Amino acid sequence: MNELDGFRAEIDRIDTELARLLELRFDLCEEIGRYKRMNGLPIENCEREKELVAARTEGMLSHQSDAVAVFRMIIRRAKRIQKEKLNLYLVGMPGSGKSRTARRLARAIEKPVADTDKLIIDKQGMSIDEIFDTHGEAFFREIESETLLGVAERGGHVVATGGGILTVERNIPIIKGSGIVVFLNRDISILLNAKTANRPLIRGGREAVLKLYAERIETYRKCA
């Protein structure tokens, strides 16, 4: 082996170790992202990022600026990994088109779709109407919150939420902390003509829809 081959062999060894460590680092970044989503913490922490880069490179005697550039690139990729796991939540009244919009949007941006009502129906083996009629709204809301936690932890989905998911206070920081919230504010005249199947709280017709809209509109707006 000549001198050049020796240099290259050493670089190969270092690169192999770097690849292993990068994989480990990015896996940990995913776990940190999950923790942030579940605890409502922001992905961005610019001050800490500056401190991290400075601390990792301050003792270098050569190529410090190159190392700074590499660390900044690694941090950018780590944040991208975490952002890719953010959900896109669609919220709004029953009949506002959340499920249909979620499916279309998921296809457009190539992300999987999650529909909290459908997940509940599949798990319980009952329609939403049957769950309400058999077990009551409080039971449904508890199951809905559990379902939301699972969706938030998995991340990376376009999520069609149930119309009343934001009426449970503990759900709000989970949704806001684990993704982007979009309010589908459909015209009230369209909502009045929405189908009532699996929408037990609007089975009362026009008055029920108007009452529900008045009760929820500000919460939808504040969360989006």
What are these regions (language model features)?
Residues 93:
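P-loop (Walker A) phosphate-binding loop of NTP-binding proteins
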Residues 177-219:
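A glycine- and Lys/Arg-enriched "phosphate-lid" helix/loop adjacent to the NTP-binding pocket
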Residues 115-173:
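ATP-dependent small-molecule kinase phosphotransfer cores
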Residues 1-86:
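Domain-level signature for soluble enzymes in the chorismate/prephenate branch of the shikimate pathway
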Residues 155, 178-179, 223-224:
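Short, well-ordered alpha-helix to beta-strand connector turns
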Residues 99:
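Walker A/P-loop
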Residues 90:
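Hydrophobic anchor at the beta1->P-loop junction of P-loop NTPases
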